[in-house]
Amino acid sequence: KDSVYAFPFTSNTWFMYYDKSVFTDDDIKSFDTMLSKGKVSFPLSNSWYIQAFYAGNGCTLFGDGTDEAAGIDFGGDKAAAVTNYLVDLVANPNFINDQDGAGIAGLRDGSVNAIFSGSWDAASVKEALGDNYGVAALPTFTVDGNECQMKSFAGSKAIGVNPNCENPQIAMSLAAYLSGEEAQQAHYDERNILPSNTNIT
């Protein structure tokens, strides 16, 4: 408390990119609807992403995310229902596991119509989709007849300073500048790196 650990400079989460020529504004609200209308790629073998389904059905990591004593609750009926959903998902011919760049490669050649990633892939997706470039919040999915909201991890990337360096105050000043409002705006303008500074967002 009341300590500086690092200087945040961008968000670190993920969302959905999609081809607007394939999916309507209503389609993108439901993962299951999207799977019925086009090819959807999701990084199912990546644990940073797969938890979105479990969290969406009520499984928790440290309670609300801040209660270490609450531990991890990814068991029981809620988790089993999601696991069964994912088994069926893998068998769906319109689903493609996004590994080794399969998602963006598929957007480029038209074999994929939606992927799940973060701002780091914005330029590549925009290049692949052109005027059909769409970005949206995560959709819902249906488990045992219940509509569940996918939930991604939310965090930030930050600039840290070694407290044992020769000039820690100068290093902290540099880190503060590099993560400041002006620098974050420049990163967004030049490289599409989304800012964490609320004066910009």
Region roles according to the model:
Residues 29, 96-109, 120:
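Short helix-initiation/N-cap motifs at beta->coil->alpha
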Residues 1-18, 39-43, 145-152:
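A structural signal for short loop-to-beta-strand junctions that line the ligand-binding cleft
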